[in-house]
A protein has these predicted regions:
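Short, surface-exposed amphipathic charged segments that create phosphate/polyanion-binding patches used
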Residues: 60-64, 198-206, 304-306, 354-365
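Generic long, charged, amphipathic alpha-helical segments
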Residues: 281-307
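His/Asp/Glu-rich metal-coordinating catalytic cores
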Residues: 1-163, 169-184, 206-209
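C-terminal, active-site-flanking charged/polar segments
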Residues: 271, 322-367
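Hard-cation-handling environments
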Residues: 140-279, 311, 326-328, 332-337, ...
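A general structural motif
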Residues: 96, 129-134, 225-235, 253-256, ...
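Active-site metal-binding loops of divalent metal-dependent hydrolases
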Residues: 70, 94-96, 120-121, 156-158, ...
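Charged, amphipathic alpha-helical linkers/stalks
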Residues: 143, 347-410
Length: 424
């Protein structure tokens, strides 16, 4: 899906480039590239050790554990054995899922870790009380349909779309929407359609007890009367031609690509319509609503519960995958709780063996000036190199001052094409 979006954007930019005489661009990768990469994938079940290397210098094994973030998400355990040493396990948490979410199981713990690399996305906050998803969504649907409008929901194709279908099935089954009982629901995203099929095919391994109970009673948690899936561009464009109040679920969830932009174009100007975000509101004429609490990430309490489930404390916890301040906050919190922990900088090198941990290289740090204070932030070596190239480009521009207008125009067009390619 990402490759398809890149191909579409390249096609659109190249049409503009042909009119202006600018240099043509190529997508970073194509659908064919993605399909070729998929041939290299090897499916692995949860909780099964897979041998990655076995030779005279040692043995490395890998195991996936369901971490409850998305369908198929996993933490990764690496068991490393070297001659003359006790085998040790390093665990990479990945994104740790939220608990008590619809459809998929709660996150599991790998059981043992000598060294842990742990995410910290929400390491400084709690999600608060669980919202009434069904009640909140029902209220949005009822008020919008009563005004004759559509409910447009920008949604991630994997995970979020399926959760919404799960809620809407229950809303319809309980007859919560009065006067619009047969309201249609359109899922307008080829990737969301494929993802929903994968959810249905893997219910035995991935569904939680509540969703499994529905399946065992003969009900599909993701199917209900009035559900329509749009595959073709023509089917997508026809959705807004029908005046019937409806739900439109479409990707991308951030509204920066995909078919959702078409639906926003046709509904944002209509005050009777509602755009339902699981994110930040936008000031437009259509009513903007927010359905809170639908987070795939564990909060501070969830991270702590997952960490405490190990059979014994890891010898060291490396904190990553969070905003700088949050990662530092979570690492300090772990230290207060008696863990050996650190939030390393990008590019840092650590040596861990037989329970001993040492930092060999600190990594990349730099100071940035904010309005009130200076703060140390992490920056990658790749970004530093990119910034240096930007300075070099300015020097080259200055060196070309006084050059032929034709050459300067060509140079400017090349820079504009490069900016258009990466400014997205």
């Amino acid at each position: 899906d990402s490759a398809h979006i890149q191909e579409q954007e390249a096609e659109w930019k190249n049409r503009k480039a042909m009119r202006s005489g600018a240099e043509m661009i190529e997508p970073d990768y194509t659908v064919e590239d993605a399909q070729n990469v998929m041939k290299q994938f090897v499916p692995c079940p949860y909780e099964t050790w897979q041998t990655l290397f076995d030779g005279p210098t040692g043995k490395i094994e890998m195991r996936f554990t369901d971490v409850g973030h998305l369908l198929g998400s996993a933490s990764v355990s690496l068991r490393i054995a070297e001659p003359g040493r006790t085998p040790e396990i390093i665990v990479f948490s990945g994104d740790i899922g939220n608990t008590h979410q619809p459809l998929i199981k709660d996150p599991s713990n790998p059981g043992h870790a000598d060294y842990l690399v742990m995410e910290s996305t929400y390491g400084d906050r709690s999600h608060g009380p669980k919202p009434d998803y069904i009640g909140d969504l029902s209220a949005v649907l009822q008020s919008t349909f009563d005004k004759g409008g559509n409910v447009v929901i920008p949604s991630f194709a994997v995970g979020r779309t399926q959760e919404l279908l799960y809620f809407i099935r229950q809303i319809k089954a309980e007859g919560r929407i009065k006067g619009h009982e047969n309201f249609p629901v359109f899922v307008d995203s080829p990737l969301a359609s494929k993802s929903t099929t994968i959810f249905r095919e893997n219910f035995a391994e991935c569904y939680d007890d509540e969703a499994l109970a529905l399946v065992q009673s003969g009900r599909n948690p993701l199917q209900f009367p009035g559900l329509h899936v749009s595959e073709t561009k023509e089917e997508s464009m026809a959705i807004n031609g029908d005046p019937t109040p409806k739900v439109i679920i479409s990707a991308a969830g951030m509204c920066d690509a995909g078919r959702i932009r078409h639906h926003l174009k046709y509904n944002l100007w209509r005050p009777e319509c509602t755009v339902l975000f699981v994110g930040e509101p936008v000031q437009v004429k259509a009513r903007i609503a927010q359905l809170g609490g639908l987070s795939g990430h564990a909060d501070k309490d969830g991270l702590e519960a997952w960490l405490r489930a190990f059979d014994e404390k890891p010898k060291f916890v490396f904190v990553n995958h969070g905003e700088d301040a949050v990662a530092e906050h979570w690492a300090n919190h772990l230290k207060e709780e008696g863990y050996e922990a650190d939030a390393p900088y990008n590019g840092s090198i650590w040596i861990a063996a037989e329970g001993r941990v040492a930092c060999a290289e600190v990594g990349n740090t730099r100071k940035i000036i904010k309005t009130k204070s200076a703060e140390t932030v992490r920056t990658s070596a790749a970004y530093d190199r990119l910034a240096n190239m930007g300075q070099r480009l300015l020097e080259v521009i200055r060196h070309n001052q006084g050059g032929a207008n034709k050459d300067l125009a060509k140079f400017a067009s090349q820079i504009a094409a490069l900016c258009d390619k990466w400014d997205r």
